């Protein structure tokens, strides 16, 4: 399933201090935000690497919306995963762009024919999709670009919550400390692509809550080997 990326859950622990050098890279230097959607997916009776490759090839030919900036599939890489199903992720420039994109997709006869044709390969819960504000707080290409031939990479996701009495501003300080640690790594030793992003919840208006919320942290590595290297360094 070369065109899909993989999930591997870990417990993510961050140790933070409040000292950040004035000339270091911080959250505010990047702060690139998108509207991301997640859909739970289940494999059908015709699920195989070949059938998925064919399905994805046709899917890419249907994409012509410039506001859809990314689409990824995830399958479990371990029996110990938090979820035994797969996931489909879409990244849009905004919530409004996502709504317009879905309206266009649902009215496209070719898109509907594609969905029906491959229903036995993979079925995704479109109506039950969840929405998140996705934030790159650090340059996703700081460690280089991800391999593009297969498009696969290794990822892990961790559920997070703010500690009691801590605010979102406190969290930003912690993020800046993590960025400072990333900046300290030897790029010759850590030469494979790595990026991370935050999946922040939205209220009914698509806005971020101000306190008492849970979120997801996503790590994206070029390979499971580089994931292990990074985890050991941390």
What residues fall within each predicted segment?
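Sec-dependent N-terminal signal peptides
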Residues: 4-14
């Amino acid at each position: 399933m070369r065109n899909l990326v993989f999930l591997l859950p870990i417990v993510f622990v961050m140790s933070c201090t409040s000292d950040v050098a004035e000339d270091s890279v911080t959250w505010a230097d990047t702060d690139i935000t998108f509207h991301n959607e997640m859909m739970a997916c289940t494999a059908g009776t015709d699920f195989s690497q070949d059938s998925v490759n064919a399905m994805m090839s046709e899917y890419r030919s249907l994409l012509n919306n410039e506001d859809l900036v990314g689409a990824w599939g995830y399958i479990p890489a371990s029996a110990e995963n938090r979820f035994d199903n797969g996931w489909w992720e879409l990244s849009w420039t905004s919530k409004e762009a996502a709504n317009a994109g879905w309206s266009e997709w649902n009215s496209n006869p070719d898109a509907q024919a594609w969905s029906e044709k491959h229903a036995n390969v993979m079925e995704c819960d479109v109506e039950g999709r969840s929405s998140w504000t996705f934030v790159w707080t650090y340059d996703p290409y700081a460690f280089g670009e991800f391999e593009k031939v297969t498009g696969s990479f290794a990822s892990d996701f961790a559920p997070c919550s703010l500690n009691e009495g801590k605010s979102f501003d406190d969290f930003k300080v912690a993020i800046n400390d993590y960025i400072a640690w990333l900046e300290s790594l030897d790029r010759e030793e850590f030469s494979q692509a790595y990026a991370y992003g935050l999946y922040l919840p939205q209220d009914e208006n698509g806005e971020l809550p101000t306190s008492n919320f849970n979120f997801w942290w996503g790590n994206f590595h070029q390979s499971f080997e580089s994931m292990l290297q990074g985890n050991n360094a941390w």
